[in-house]
Amino acid sequence: MPTEMINESVKDITYDAIKIGLASPEKIREWSRGEVRKPETINYRTLKPEKDGLFCEKIFGPNKDWECHCGKYKKIRYKGVVCDRCGVEVTKASVRRERMGHIELAAPVSHIWYFKGIPSRMGLILDLSPRTLEKVLYFASYIVLDKGTTDLQYKQVLNEKEFREAYDKYGDRFRVGMGAEAIMELLEAIDLEKESKDLKRGLKESTGQKRARIIKRLEVVEAFRESGNKPEWMIMTVVPVIPPDLRPMVQLDGGRFATSDMNDLYRRIINRNNRLKRLLELGAPDIIVRNEKRMLQEAVDALIDNGRRGRPVTGPGNRPLKSLSDMLKGKQGRFRQNLLGKRVDYSGRSVIVVGPELKIYQCGLPKEMAIELFKPFVMKELVAKGTAHNIKSAKKMVERLQPEVWDILEEVIREHPVMLNRAPTLHRLGIQAFEPVLVEGKAIKLHPLVCTAFNADFDGDQMAVHLPLSVEAQAECRFLLLSPNNLLKPSDGGPVAVPSQDMVLGIYYLTLQKPGDIGEGKYFKSVNEAILAYENGVISLHAMIKVRRTGLNAEGVEESRTIESTVGRFIFNEIISQDLGFVDRSKPENFLALEIDFHTGKKQLKKILEKCINTRGATQTAETLDAIKSLGYKYSTRAAMTVSISDMTVPEAKKDIIERAEKQVEDIAKNHRRGLMTEEERYKAVIETWKEADDEITKELLSGLDKYNNIFMMADSGARGSDKQIKQLAGMRGLMADTSGKTIELPIKANFREGLDVLEYFISAHGARKGLSDTALRTADSGYLTRRLVDVSQDLIIREVDCGEGTDEIPGMEIKAFMDGKEVIEGLEDRIIGRYACETIYDDNGELIVKKNHIITPKRAARIVASKAFEDPNATIKIRTVLSCKSHIGVCAKCYGANMATGEAVQVGEAVGIIAAQSIGEPGTQLTMRTFHTGGVAGDDITQGLPRVEELFEARKPKGLAIIAEFGGTVTIKDTKKKREVIVTRTSNDTLESKAYLIPYGSRIKVMDEQVIEAGDELTEGSVNPHDILKIKGVRAVQDYMIQEVQRVYRLQGVEINDKHIEVIVRQMLKKVRVENNGDAEFLPGTMVDILEYNDVNESLAAKGLEQAEGKQVMLGITKASLATNSFLSAASFQETTKVLTEAAIKGKIDPLIGLKENVIIGKLIPAGTGMKHYRNVKLDTDQNQEITFSEDEFDNGNYEGNFSGNDFKQNFYENEDFNSDEEVSFTEDEYFEDEENDLSTENFDDLKFSEEEE
């Protein structure tokens, strides 16, 4: 019996943080396995590494597993032996990926990151300007190291001529140096404690530029003082050599070698270093040595960051060589290419085809792909069943595809879900799990209803398949990722698996009613009889007939009714559950009425599904969806709708309407010639005229179309096309925009039915081309925006249930409906659904609607909005929001409210930050890029669409800036020939205070003379700078403004996003405070600190009676906010990698590994969802003898307490309105959550015996 081998080398390391710092020369020597002395790489004849060279086996380890360089020791039995002939340790070749070497430099060199970065850290700590420093480092100037008895200054910089003069004057009484040696000596001499005290004293006395410089210097000095890094470590005396397998050399076909750029860079350093050593031994003249030292400095610079200073070192074909910094930077760098995204095994990709016969939780997997993916599972089964004797023969069987393999594959595949992913994965619905069904051919079959979520179509799209291996991964796929669990959009909670195109058309045709059709008015004894009559052509699908239905009424007595409807609707109702709430079942006459007795298009289907998910839960909805899909396809086939040219009837009135419009345009032109209107007014009037004509024709056309016209039915059902397309086919094409987006005043009067003439065709070509190029640009912009949003919000996770636990006051905000003038952008109801109320709310009769700190469900929200108090559009209601959450890391479940994707209270561990970023970024592609021109010259551009969203989130000064009043008061408008001014006057403490605002040419004034305004009101039209709002009106106002503006852009495009997603991002943008006066706090003035940390420090200072720090809250754009995060790993992998790492190393930063990115980078489970600590460290002490007994009714009703899957939970949540008041359910939400956090040990299980008595 073989004993189990335990691999000693693999230790289970758990760590909670990562620290970065400067490496001291001692540390570099400690990492190293030996010094690289020669520039040689490998011997060109034997192809073996040269000794002491860049690939030396003695330093880095053997080239082949368990084999030394000279071949004396081969085979694993010599493991760990060091060969006495060649000095190579016998071990695995993979150590060549981890063992480092070093180069001892003959002269110190500076590290370019610290000398050249902005700001230059070396320059700040020495108080030298970067230019001066460069002259010293690169041997152009001398620096005084010791002034002796002369009147030179310490650290004074002398050029060649000044040095000569000083030398002639003072002789040897002073000492100068140049190059990195001199700088190193200066750095060693710095006393950080003394420097810090001096600077702090200087800070109190100085102002302006000088003060700013001192703050910058103090920051660097404090960083060195606190981190334990020594300033002289910025100068290198030893260069580390990275492992050879990370800079490989491979032989090409022609016997030539391809090598990594790193090797060239190292070779130059070694060559120059060896030459310098020789020159020093020979005692060469100073000027030659100096030149060699400068070249060595440049060689090391090129290795660390090629091209940062001077011309980059180039390889063959003038291509700059890739340095260590380039290895980390950008999309191809180490961070984004290898750490944040890796290629994985057990995956494949193929073209997708439609699989209408599949259930919604299935996908078709090609046999060849399945056998490859499930290979190890199949092999294990073969051995277990005894079909194969050992793994080797099992592998052969699988590779030869023997017949018995297929049967086993069928078994293995059962109940083992796979994940499908379509790139680009814009939101979490882009990856879903399905149960595989084996199919012939090589294409993956996809269920048509999940296409919307993947944004997939079948014109050649490809999808990737991934196989979850571990039991946990399979369980997560089944319970979280399986497509029936993803029926709702996380962005707005609407259904995502809505039937489209053919299915919609089929259902529309099925529920159509045509008066006077064959068999109208006939009676049938049952639905089946009616269907039989239809199948035999006695009645039509759309004829109104009467059918007898029988059922149990409210008293439980059987009762029959005659119901009038169409056969189609009877058929449709067979598959729809009859309690969705479309019919009021409390009325006795309705109890047998059809649930869906109306014409059903896409909009209606969406409503049906919404109600179905809310009342029946996921499993039932999935079945209904599949039934709708089958019916839809069946009847769209039966309908056999076609489109022919005769379907497009051009309205009679078209000719007259166009003639009228032409006459009107002629009149406008006449007025313009007579000087009665300006060019801009004329242009606007012409466009307006044609728009009206166009609308009129469209109206005529649509009213003239037959209700049963095929094209009309397609558009009306929502299957494909819209009024716009019908208008172009049979009305007029209308006005077109030119390439700049300005509307061409000459419309296209023809339609496609009549055909366009050459000029019209040419004009319309503009639009077609612009459409395509816009889409391409939009996709890239939208992707980049999503990336920034994810980066700024990725560490926001639900960390606790309630941040206000134990306090009386519930943090929250007053909110009201968003209005744009009279138009509602977002109603109050939309804004309060799924939030927690801060106060108890009653209706008009004083009946309780929702208790304090309980959730507002859709039904409750409807009741709140219906009550009299909320008829006023400005009525407010106080709810909990993410913006007022007091959690220190992440946010709490109650402030977030309901999870949109399940409609229930959000669970601890949900990565709400990433969901928010995806919800905002995913519709980004639909937003128009176009900057709308208000026409004409002077009209200013107001940015809209994607650029506007970007402008808001980056907190930029907007284009078309509105001027706002800094304080409230009375307005007077002065309008003279030269200038227009708005003067705001206010009286404070009996003194008149006024401020004049100059109005630029072309801006429209928004206020009236003598109007009384408030601080922060707009004086001119345009967008407001959010920073101004923050300054004048404060944080609350700017939060509201941001949410409202982002919502405006999305809602105008018809995209619905829940407020809470925008709130999450805005919370991240407003996290920092700029310290203005540090008081007795440790902060440096002018630095940014986290607002929660700032408040905590101030609270503790106040408690001690010390002076508090003063600061102003600042708003950072999302890019800046991402870089200002506590995690240097996350920031470095985002942008400006070298800058982030330079700063982090000097400060000796510690990454607490709180967010998701940093954990992905180091390869730990992410701290969200099931990877959270309190879900991972659960111990189950099971007592074998204990049984859990259910009483029978409980078991049948299935209301056992426990964490059931989202949708069952949701079903209870909706049916049972008072879900979270204690009377109805045996646990409140808090208890429900408390349980999860406990260590589930036996004492919790003791009372799990349910018995009859308790009932």
UniProtKB/Swiss-Prot annotation:
A cellular component annotation (GO) from this entry: DNA-directed RNA polymerase complex
Catalytic activity from the UniProt record: RNA(n) + a ribonucleoside 5'-triphosphate = RNA(n+1) + diphosphate
E.C. number: 2.7.7.6
Entry note: cofactor: Binds 1 Mg(2+) ion per subunit. Binds 2 Zn(2+) ions per subunit.
Keywords: DNA-directed RNA polymerase, Magnesium, Metal-binding, Nucleotidyltransferase, Transcription, Transferase, Zinc
GO BP term, pick one: DNA-templated transcription
Signal sequence, renumbered to the chain: none
Biological role: DNA-dependent RNA polymerase catalyzes the transcription of DNA into RNA using the four ribonucleoside triphosphates as substrates.
Name this polypeptide is given: DNA-directed RNA polymerase subunit beta'
Organism: Lachnoclostridium phytofermentans (strain ATCC 700394 / DSM 18823 / ISDg) (Clostridium phytofermentans)
